Amino acid sequence: MSDRSARSATKIMLCLAFVLSTAPRLICQGGNTASLTCWEGKDRSNFQSRKAKSPTAKASGGFAYAEAVAEASKDMGDAQFCKNKVQLFYSKDGNDYKVVYEKSGLEDQGVGIRVLGWSHTGTQLLLEVAVWGYDRDMDLVKSALALDSVTGEVKELPLSDAFERVLGKDCEYDSSVVGWGNDDSVLIRVGKTPPTTRYNQTFCVDKPTVYAFNMRSRSLARSSP
């Protein structure tokens, strides 16, 4: 190798070393796929990219787990930004997992995912996906989804339409997926939303109430205690 070639190779290696040393590290932490962020600590001083993986949910319908990534970045003014992405991995036999669901947040938008377990029949996996804004001007939006082990497809449950039929159109409420009922209905807890001064709120839920969503009829009914 000539001296010129050797110098060029050395420059390339030094450049690669610099890039690798300055690239943000991806810190893996526990199973917090529901609310993973780029910040940690009381003063939010620990700012970096992070990754989380849920435990594997197992049933006769297959195996599934979720991953969440919070990607940290800064602009020229050193302002901090965080963007999330979540994925659901599924396998029939525990081998060769494939991504069957993926959702990426917009700039400075968080996305989380909860794996709530398989139905009693082992054919459907219940999930909850949440989207929020890191600038705090965006409301937290939650969606319930189900993975069908027969088709391998993930579909959103039409809970908004079902609650509109029960509670009415102009109704504000906070909802959270509880899990599966004994009859493989999906249990949803609704309650009052946090107060805000950004708009006039219309409440129709006085106290936390659990509803059962029938997967076949797409209807809601109050769940027995």
Where on the chain are the PLM-derived regions?
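Bacterial N-terminal signal peptides that target proteins for export
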Residues: S2-M13
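Bacterial N-terminal signal peptides
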Residues: M13-S21
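Acidic, small-residue rich beta-repeat scaffolds with periodic aromatic anchors
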Residues: S21-P55, A144-P225
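Terminal domain-start segments
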Residues: C28-D108, T209, N214-S217
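Blade-terminus and WD-like Trp-Asp/Gly-His loop motifs, strongest in beta-propeller folds
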Residues: K51-F63, V69, L116-Q124, V177-V186
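Short glycine/acidic-enriched loop and turn motifs that connect beta-strands
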Residues: E71-M76, V131-D135, T193-T197
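Short, solvent-exposed loop/turn segments at conserved positions within beta-propeller repeat blades
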Residues: D78-N84, R136-V141, Q201-D206
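Extracellular-facing segments of soluble proteins and assemblies that are Gly/Ser/Thr-biased and enriched
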Residues: G105-L147
